[in-house]
Amino acid sequence: MATYLIGDVHGCYDELIALLHKVEFTPGKDTLWLTGDLVARGPGSLDVLRYVKSLGDSVRLVLGNHDLHLLAVFAGISRNKPKDRLTPLLEAPDADELLNWLRRQPLLQIDEEKKLVMAHAGITPQWDLQTAKECARDVEAVLSSDSYPFFLDAMYGDMPNNWSPELRGLGRLRFITNAFTRMRFCFPNGQLDMYSKESPEEAPAPLKPWFAIPGPVAEEYSIAFGHWASLEGKGTPEGIYALDTGCCWGGSLTCLRWEDKQYFVQPSNRHKDLGEAAAS
């Protein structure tokens, strides 16, 4: 029984299947963790969703910003952009089934035995684990309800960018969504910066990567995340695992076998352009 953590798939179905064959992943025996952004940019978003859904209890995933954007397109709120290559999925006969399944997936995964936490963008240093759990449940409850289009219409935006337990309503939900799915840099007090997308070395002072600011979750748990392809899996502290290595941009799809911390890599079938990845 092994646990495999894989970074952002972004519709790269062929690379996903090749990587799973490489590690000899066995559904029903092994467990697959996915950091979110299953869809968009790669050519196989439909096949990725069908396959991941078919895994049932053998998969644990979190939603990413591109997954949420897909749901907004599906709900008629956002425009379907050709570069996202989502049309085959949106026009598929099982689109309703797949996307209603997708919107019921979580923002946060926790394994207490492994002391492992996973979220698409990471965990803001302003939260302890109990707060992160409660915040994830708040958004998950709205997404799985009949009123989810109303939330998706209001989720776009960069403010508020500072956590307070007093946040209420759509502002609270927007902050939670941004923290779980869009965060990269923070100010020293943990306040989110939603504008900078440079590499950590090029970010203006006083910004730091979220994982460089001490927080209560990282003191007790390992954290796995995706979202930040331009990191190329490098530069994180011990116990923080950056798994998005830009497969859809011509990088690679990366897998971490949790039990022995061994990495496996499947090169992308596309030309490398991590500069575009930094802007996504």
UniProtKB/Swiss-Prot annotation:
Keywords of this entry: Hydrolase
Major enzyme class: hydrolase
Molecular function via GO: bis(5'-nucleosyl)-tetraphosphatase (symmetrical) activity
Reactions accelerated catalytically: P(1),P(4)-bis(5'-adenosyl) tetraphosphate + H2O = 2 ADP + 2 H(+)
E.C. numbers: 3.6.1.41
Chain segments annotated as coiled-coil in the UniProt record: none
Task performed by this protein: Hydrolyzes diadenosine 5',5'''-P1,P4-tetraphosphate to yield ADP.
Membership in a protein family: Belongs to the Ap4A hydrolase family.
Matches recorded under HAMAP family: ApaH
Protein name according to UniProt: Bis(5'-nucleosyl)-tetraphosphatase, symmetrical
Species the sequence originates in: Shigella flexneri
